[in-house]
Amino acid sequence: MPNIKSAIKRVRTTETAEERNISKKNAMRTAVKRAKTAISTDAENKDELLRFAIKQVDKASQSNLIHSNKADRIKSKLMSANK
């Protein structure tokens, strides 16, 4: 456990940032899964879900939650599955 005041604060901010990042990453994964299932079942709202999933992947990439190459790979797989 840190003794210095700034280190104590840093631990707190790191924990909150970690929770935020995990939440955003989970939301991205859920959006991608929903888009995949909508594409495979040929649902009516698959285009809307696909756009939302791509938006979530881009946001995760911009905030360095996932690498940009991985984001491109995910988007490419979704788009090719939608054809």
Curated annotation (Swiss-Prot):
One of its GO terms (cellular component) is small ribosomal subunit. Pfam families: Ribosomal_S20p (PF01649). PANTHER family: 30S RIBOSOMAL PROTEIN S20, SMALL RIBOSOMAL SUBUNIT PROTEIN BS20C. The keyword Ribonucleoprotein applies. Residues 12-21 have a biased composition (Basic and acidic residues). Belongs to the bacterial ribosomal protein bS20 family. This is Small ribosomal subunit protein bS20. Residues 1-21 are annotated as: Disordered. The lineage of its organism: Bacteria, Bacillati, Bacillota, Bacilli, Bacillales. The keyword Protein transport does not apply. It comes from Staphylococcus epidermidis (strain ATCC 35984 / DSM 28319 / BCRC 17069 / CCUG 31568 / BM 3577 / RP62A). Keywords: Ribonucleoprotein, Ribosomal protein, RNA-binding, rRNA-binding. Binds directly to 16S ribosomal RNA. GO terms for biological process: translation. It comes from the Bacteria. One of its GO terms (molecular function) is small ribosomal subunit rRNA binding.
